[in-house]
């Protein structure tokens, strides 16, 4: 009987242990699955963390195994022995567990915990209120009136309104991923209409909410492209009769989502692996894209058109949809484009429809009747080399590539140059030109003559008069045309030169806007000489309503060709840096002989395209990556110069004090500083550097890691750009800066300024425009605004991160140098030279055969050399594989976006003086940026010595308490033993 009792006790003990293990595993699985579904982490993140921290739990596992063996082996021993064995095993296990958790928390998980446990400040209600007003102002100035037949808008005399479309109850406020929406509750579309004075038909609201409440997820790890629209047959006769009696006015909302991690589907019947669509059967035919309206939406529009006199369609999509359907319905008389307006921007939509705000936005992209006419259509997407091998640690089975064969002819520059002179053909292809937008009032613009001043300056002015009956703002757009020689340097026929927005003009009021430009602003990059040049001949500067419709033309003549050694604002001479990026055997589009090579240049690449040898080598890093040769002396380290980082605030980059400060750092200090750059820069005790925080994203400060961050979600970048108001961008930057200053956030992962190369780009909402001049102007102003309050803005993604497909698997992007410089680098150059950017995030992709983060020509020769950039450069999320920290440091990258140092983020070769010098240079860039931020403002300097973070103090306090508890438990065990087993 006693033997059975001991056996039963053994099994109970083992059952408890196994049960605890199962419960822990189940909880971990549920938590990890939730994080993956929310897009917070990927399986790669989980595996890297397990690989990094798992080894620390091996002793704990061994101890647990020994305890289990002991329970089995000793289960027949005396009761007193088993009493001691079980209790001492439990206490030992708890002690080792506490020790292990401590080692992991202050070791590999310390950087992540430093962010997750950040002690952030509270943004005042006054600042949040001002941010909300700025958000609403941007949305109001950025929304574009596309159609207003019979002056159907505004609905200023009526309150009742019907709102159709499932998206009306689930509109998009922004995109997903790093540019996603923050924690503060948004004003929804219905509330925006109510706040403007409307009374929406709530029967329709309840109908759509009953159909489906949540929006399908389009995130990094999940792409559900379902368009939840009720079938026309589900609209009951009773509900429609009520709606007709309620109002003759109807608003229809159609939205399209997008986000980080995936481009939009070109063919809804052939989705990429892992993507899903659960919409109504037959919604799309073969070859129809996500940017077309589906069958159910069309039937809904037919029903609305049949039952209501005045129908206005709201396009809630950042990506340019095919909007030809707006011409298919007799009662669809109005249309407004409003992509993600941020948390309060739908108030602006209500005010526009009500007539309280005059729409003054202009399109930032060209809208086509058929997106297949985009010049990049056949060279945007998933293309794999036929001879590619699996990229190391990327999870991709092949080597991906994309050919930018359209060259400089992106967006309107292609359509205006190729079709602009043939108005009939142009109108059949282009529905709405770049820069297009209507108003409720009328304006007349008159342009002065050109005045040529000294040093190549040209000045002119434009006077705008409100000739209508309503107050409103107008946009002034000026473009240039440079002389083109057949077969010479490629030049678009139309190029945005300068733009501005008027103040609010009452009827009869006018405003004169003055412009001064450099002749060099009209220069083209000559790949033969590696210089920007102005060819001799006649130059036109045109005042236009948009990229197509001319108001006035002025011209000047240049007698002799000018070649610029360097552009105004540059610090070093320009030379060819990207010859290899052009690739071999790729045909690029040319204007020669009226685009004679268009068919060949714009064709899709062959399925049997083979990777060049250089690609096979440079995309399998670190297998082919070698440590730099050890040269020179080891830099001074651990010096006792008694300097603190705070003392360097305001000092020039070249001040001798920097060398003395850097001498104080140990090699391990430098390694730590450059490694753990994930949403932060770490504390370094030797120089009294405090912990700082860098947060996402382009729509305002947000975080995947820190929950309940109370900051503002501003309108999407393309809506900001659609204001065509540089001051609006500056205002947005200032509010981000104010919120960052209040919260204790020093770095902002934004703005993003890649180009809308193709309508299907997943992050179109996050980028400004298809035009680099517009993008660069907006970016520079946002950066200047944030900098005013000590927040350094990470201009991103440097460079050419223009598609999401294959971006993390080392996609090789091939482009000629002219297009790289004139189109894809120009916004960044403007951000540096005009916006004085001090932080940069580079990109996952390769330019040619070199990863951006290890591209010396890009990082050192152009960014730091030509442009004179002194700030820090960080990788995009450090994902291993082709990303290698030693290679990055050697080629101009300073900081790894890593929270755990895994997957090669931690530089190796600490005894190599070359590596140490590279880390020292990187540390200089990081520290120079940080010390001139709000982290070292007058108030912040007081706490600059606080290098022991609050979460560590709490951890140490908990450790002391646990040790005391363990000691007390041990005393209790001794007491119980003596009481129970006294001889």
Model-identified regions with their sequence ranges:
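Short beta-strand elements
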Residues: 549-567
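Extracellular/periplasmic metallocenter environments
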Residues: 530
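Glycoside hydrolase catalytic-domain context in secreted enzymes
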Residues: 1-524, 533-547, 566-983
